[in-house]
């Protein structure tokens, strides 16, 4: 197996590793019923609707 020719500094090593562990924002979309931002493919926490149907009864 090949060995590194010279030592990588900790900063260079860490900056290289950081590229593979980037955090991405979750997919947020606007609820078509109440126009609040919600996670995609999930029931809206504000109104309880998903795909035009009331899934969860929310007290108003």
Curated annotation (Swiss-Prot):
Keyword entries, A-Z: Ribonucleoprotein, Ribosomal protein
SUPFAM superfamilies: Zn-binding ribosomal proteins
Gene Ontology BP annotations: translation
UniProt name for this protein: Large ribosomal subunit protein bL32
Gene, per the UniProt record: rpmF
GO molecular function, one term: structural constituent of ribosome
InterPro entries (UniProt xref): Ribosomal_bL32, Ribosomal_bL32_bact, Ribosomal_zn-bd
Keyword hit for rRNA-binding: no
């Amino acid at each position: 197996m090949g060995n590194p020719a010279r030592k990588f500094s900790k900063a260079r090593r860490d900056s290289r590793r950081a590229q593979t562990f980037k955090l991405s924002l979750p997919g947020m979309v606007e609820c078509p019923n109440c126009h609040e931002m919600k996670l995609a493919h999930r029931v809206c926490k504000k109104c309880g609707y998903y795909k035009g149907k009331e899934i969860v009864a929310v007290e108003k």
